[in-house]
C-alpha cells in the first residue's frame, strides 16, 4: 500500500465531475494512525499498516441516514517530517482537511499543534473546514477530545475556519461516523456561504 509523493496532486475539480465526490486530505504526524483510520472506513475492519512513505487514496461512501450518503475521495498523506513540506500539494483547493493526532502520545501534541496551525493557515487553505480526529481513544492514558482541542489550540485558528474535534479509534471505529458527518456539514456550510453573500448584494 502507498504511492510516492509528487509535487503535483489531483484537486477537487478533477474528481467532482466524474465521481460527485468531495476531496478530503488526511494529514497528521507519523504514527498517528491515519492509514489505519482510512482502511477502517474503507473495509470496516482494523488494518495494521506500515508507515506511509507517500500517499494512499480511497473512495469512501458514508451513509447520512436512510438512503442518503456522501462520497469522499480521501487522500492519506505520509506524516514523516521530510514529507510535510509536500502536504500543501495535496491540500490545495481541497474541500476539507482531516488532521489526525495520537491522543495517547501526549509528548508530541505540541509538534502536532505547530503542524496543524501551519497547514490550516497556509494561503491555499484559508477557510477550509478542519476535522481533528483525536485517535487511539481505546488506549490507556489517551486524552479526551476536549483536552486535545485545548492542547492543539484549535480555537485559535482563523475565525473563518470551521473546526470540529472528534474522539475516535481505528481499532473499533468509534467516532468516525459522527466525525465525517460533522465534516460534511462544515463543507456544505462553506459551499453555501458564497451563494448567500451574493443573494444579499
Swiss-Prot record:
Gene Ontology CC: one annotated term: plasma membrane
InterPro entries: P-loop_NTPase, Small_GTP-bd, Small_GTPase_ARF, Small_GTPase_ARF/SAR
CDD domains with a match to the protein in the record: Arl4_Arl7
Pfam family, any one: Arf
Sites where the protein binds GTP: 28-35, 76-80, 135-138
GO molecular function: GTP binding; GTPase activity
Lipidation feature positions (N-myristoyl glycine): 2
Cytoplasm as UniProt keyword: yes
Subcellular compartments: Nucleus, Nucleolus; Cell membrane; Nucleus; Cytoplasm
Keyword entries, A-Z: Cell membrane, Cytoplasm, GTP-binding, Lipoprotein, Membrane, Myristate, Nucleotide-binding, Nucleus
Subunit structure comment from the entry: Interacts with CYTH2; the interaction is direct and ARL4D GTP-dependent. Does not interact with ARL4D.
Family: Belongs to the small GTPase superfamily. Arf family.
Role played: Small GTP-binding protein which cycles between an inactive GDP-bound and an active GTP-bound form, and the rate of cycling is regulated by guanine nucleotide exchange factors (GEF) and GTPase-activating proteins (GAP). GTP-binding protein that does not act as an allosteric activator of the cholera toxin catalytic subunit. Recruits CYTH1, CYTH2, CYTH3 and CYTH4 to the plasma membrane in GDP-bound form.
Official protein name in the record: ADP-ribosylation factor-like protein 4D
Lineage: Eukaryota, Metazoa, Chordata, Craniata, Vertebrata
Encoding gene (name): Arl4d
Amino acid at each position: 500500500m502507498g504511492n510516492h509523493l509528487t509535487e503535483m496532486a489531483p484537486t477537487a475539480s478533477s474528481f467532482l465531475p466524474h465521481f460527485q465526490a468531495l476531496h478530503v486530505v488526511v494529514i497528521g504526524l507519523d504514527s498517528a494512525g491515519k492509514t489505519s483510520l482510512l482502511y477502517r472506513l474503507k473495509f470496516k475492519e482494523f488494518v495494521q499498516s506500515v508507515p506511509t512513505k507517500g500517499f494512499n487514496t480511497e473512495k469512501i461512501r458514508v451513509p447520512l441516514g436512510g438512503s442518503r450518503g456522501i462520497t469522499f475521495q480521501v487522500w492519506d498523506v505520509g506524516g514523516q517530517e521530510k514529507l510535510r513540506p509536500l502536504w500543501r500539494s495535496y491540500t490545495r483547493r481541497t474541500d476539507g482537511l482531516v488532521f489526525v493526532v495520537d491522543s495517547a502520545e501526549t509528548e508530541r501534541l505540541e509538534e502536532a499543534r505547530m503542524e496543524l496551525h501551519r497547514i490550516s493557515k497556509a494561503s491555499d487553505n484559508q477557510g477550509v473546514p478542519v476535522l481533528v480526529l483525536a485517535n487511539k481513544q481505546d488506549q490507556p492514558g489517551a486524552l479526551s477530545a476536549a483536552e486535545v482541542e485545548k492542547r492543539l489550540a484549535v480555537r485559535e485558528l482563523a475565525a473563518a475556519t470551521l473546526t470540529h474535534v472528534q474522539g475516535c479509534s481505528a481499532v473499533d471505529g468509534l467516532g468516525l461516523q459522527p466525525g465525517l458527518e460533522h465534516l460534511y456539514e462544515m463543507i456544505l456550510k462553506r459551499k453555501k456561504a458564497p451563494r448567500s453573500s451574493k443573494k444579499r448584494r
